[in-house]
Structure formats: C-alpha cells, structure tokens
Amino acid sequence: MEFQPLTIKHLESRLKKDLEVDPSWFVPHIQNFISYNPKGCFALVNRDKTLGIVTTTLYDNIGWIGWLYVDDSFRHQGLGERLMRKAIEYINKNKIYSVVIEAVREAATLYQRIGFESQFETHHFKLYPDKIKPNQNNNFQILPISSIPREKLADFDFKYFHQNRHELFKIIVNNPKFSGYIALENKKIIGYIFVTEDSKSLQVSPLVINLNHPHKYELTNSLLRVACNDKEKPLYLRCPSLRKQYFDFLTSIGAEPTGYFTYRMFLGKQYEIESEGVLSLGCPGKG
C-alpha cells in the first residue's frame, strides 16, 4: 500500500461504481485541484487498486483538504484517517498551520478524533430559476469574469476570503463546467458569482456581494439570473451560518432551505474566516 500523486486515472474505479457521479463534471473539477497543486493531491493505492483519494489546496496561510474518498469495499479500515493525516502532513510541511475542511456530518466524528474543531454550519439552499426576479436597475452592469483583469477580481475577493486566490481563478476560468460573472458599478466591482454545472443542477461556487449596497437585492438577482443562462436546472447555494441575515436574505429572494448542512472545521491555528458578504461558499476543498 502506497501513496501516489493523484491522476485522473485514479478516478476510474469510482466512476465505474458510483453512477450518481457525473464524469463530465467530476473529472475536470478534480483536474483543477491537480493543476493547482499537483504535489498535494494523493491517491492511496494497493498494487493497481485505488483505495482512496484526497486533495489539498494551499493559500497564503491556510490549507484546505477536500475530496476525501475511500472505496466502499475498503471502508472501516482506517484508510480515511490515513489519507487525512497524509494531507495534514503535506500542508504542515509547507509551513501552513491552519488546516480547513468542509465536513459532511457522517465524517465529523473522524475529524474530531484527529483534532479538528467545528466553527459553523454551512446550510444548503435551493433556488429555482423562475423565482429569480428580473433586474430593474440600470446603474450596474453584469459582465463575464473575462471582462476584467484577474488581478482585479483577486483583489476584490481578498477582502472577503483574506487569501490570494489569483492562481486558482486562472485555472477555473478555463474549466468548461464553470462560468463566472461580475457586477460593476462605475467600473468598480460590487459582486461576483461562479457557477458550476452538472447533469442535474447548477451549483453556486461562490457568490459574493457588497451587502451595504442600496440595491443589494437587485444586484443578487441579476447575478443569479445571468448565471442560470436560461437553464431550468435548480441552483444550489452553500450559505455559511455566520449571520442570521444571510438565511433571511436568501429566503427573501426565493431560495428554499434543503435541510442539508455540512460543518466548517479547522485544525491548528485560528484563521480569519470569511467577511460579511459571502452568501454562498465555493466548492468544498478550496473555499
């Protein structure tokens, strides 16, 4: 049994067994993680059999762990913990001592045993396109992310996530399953959205707006409407339970709580969590 650098070939056994996974979405998504940090994504292999995988995403002073998966034929043998500890070891070797995960509830006990602490719940909301109101405000523009320099987007993003994510943006804008849009007012960014699409839904990943903007509802609806791109698939949002106003805001624009939530957890040093205005977090594994 050994760790190997994660490659797309390591995904084949999961794709064959798990018919719920959409390969056209899953494969390019994992490729983003490998492209961003090829030395920090691992497969646990026994001979030619892939037993599990894990990814890491490093920013300025936090390291995200994501996509922890163990083949169901090999569960309850400690392999999940082994993969987690490998990821933690890699992050710490890079002199990053704040390790962050978005944990499914079923795995929370494992993470707590390793030493992770809960910070908040991330609640999932569903929004149907026909609930999104048309934009009646002409004071701002909604444009494709490609309309502005990535440095400008990264600077705006930094105010909310407190990490430089420029290199990640550079990778995901080339993923055909991602689309991104910005809201501009007087040439200034006041919000942005990324959406990723699979065969059944659209997933907001993330949605950030200036909540002090006088037309925040119109701004949010405008970003969501263009992100739908005339599709009828539901949008899913991952809303951090940091402030009750977030839930109230999303329900006021027509989003419905699904009842499902995950846990944001961390290990090691405290870090600065997202600032006010992050209505939906990004994909688990990269924040």
Where are the model-predicted features located?
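Extreme N-terminal starter segment of soluble prokaryotic enzymes
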Residues: M1-F3
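Amide-forming acyltransferase catalytic core, primarily the GNAT-like/NAT-type
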Residues: E12-R14, F116-Q203
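Active-site rim helix/loop that mediates acceptor-substrate recognition in acyltransferases
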Residues: E12-T55, Y160-G180
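Conserved acetyl-CoA-binding loop-helix of GNAT-fold acetyltransferases
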Residues: V70, H76-E89, K93, R113, ...
